[in-house]
């Protein structure tokens, strides 16, 4: 999830890395803009009794205590059933009956690894591959702390000359080939950022390379660097130079979940398929900027200098020219030993029964982390989920009964490839298709002060209205709303969902979804140590969110969303916004086509389908107004809720996208060469990228048909046209 709030015009260039967005709002001085608007308490909409009770139920002291618990015990996927049970027990204690749902999945764990550089003169240098122990940060010294490694990486050894491949995108490799760089049989060294890390490894593998090293570059830290005079963590907000980003290298753009059970749940007796199409065959190792420095410097003067490569973000901020190499006689030797296993994982599932059994709202966060801590990813969200359970419990004691059933989920094994949530969706898909109204996801709830939002279009209006009800503690201010800060930082644009967190399986089964969190501005806020030992309770309490006040505000926002989706008589969807957003997606597609090999490609079928959708959506909006005024017409309200629940299923096409049938939504999907960042009308754009006109025409047809199906569901309300005529 990377570009802060995704500009539609930048979709093709957008890139994503991990569960957090790659932000760049440094050109916007948020605090200055807010200050110019004046002080004083913001005008808040009237809050209902239950809204006020919900908001007032969140307490920073108890959130702090939940965060401390989650960040002081190992909880890499499949290793801590007691933490899953503790979560279920806490939810139950607060009035939400909860239990564990387990799956037996393929995972792998690190045994040993090494990396060394041999110079042409025969001298050698050994990489540390270890993050420094900090006396100020207790969990960095735990004896069972997790080594630096890549989940789903291949075991293997490799010794060879090496090539710097930039961010490891396909276009980076294409540029290297243009420059005459021999890649086959070499080891790749790539910097983080851009495509999902697994695709960096895949792209190297596809070029015949035999290993891949991925490092973190300080150029991605904006102005918050030691070079700019700031101190490194723990003494200041800059990145600790020994920090290493762990993470999965599954080929996420192909499909998420257990690589051995695509399309069906992983039970002990489930048949297993070959995992090789979606996991690497070559070894990979993540390293720190400290370890990367001598490796890059050894390439200076060999191959093409970085500035002459002419690729975006090729040159970083380390003391090297970022030359391509290879350097004759300079070789890397790498060893990576992993233990493959099938192991149980545990989802904690809690249920608040509603009065309408065929309408369900799901709220989820993953619990597993690559490190002991995980204070931001994911346990800022986990602590909020416990506090949300407490808040919902208080509402129930006060007499609240939701109209729709609420299912709360604490997922396991998200980090390996959205495994826990995907297996659960695959098991319960018939029920979800028949009942699910929406899925709300919170992953990295807090890693900084700037709120962020991505959602399917029907949820935009509810989200923005809810933001205006939450006081946002931006850098100590108490006179501004969440909406004010978000709107200033994002320009008012809600992001498009691609992949990278647990909403993925819901989106691609046509279920309305939303993902939210808060992070740094990418330029001036303290650097977030993503997937590092330094994503710790100490970092969060000192730099990320001292006092845990942003946690509280984010929990209030999530609570309001869940409350209204579960309680409002009419599901609070804005279906007309789907037409607005599809028109924007189409404008992007037209520009993409104009720059392609087939500029004459006709998209009039999509235009006609969107027009048909708009007619149906506008008719339903009129019906909603009628139902709101006629509170006694429960039949009409039920019809409206049914079509609101179901219309999104229409955008899902059987067979999915070319060569990746898991991704079935015809309007958006993770980019084939990004892994996380979204592409709109993906079947068409991928066909254009492949130079396949016939297939592009096919996916124009399939996309337009999907839009017509969704429009038809909106029009399926009994005598809808008659209702509109009576208006």
Swiss-Prot record:
Zn(2+) 1 binds at residues 366, 443. The keyword Thylakoid does not apply. Its EC number is 3.4.17.21. The keyword Transferase does not apply. It is found in: Secreted. It is an enzyme of class 3 (hydrolase). It catalyses: Release of an unsubstituted, C-terminal glutamyl residue, typically from Ac-Asp-Glu or folylpoly-gamma-glutamates. Binds 2 Zn(2+) ions per subunit. Required for NAALADase activity. This is Probable glutamate carboxypeptidase ARB_02390.
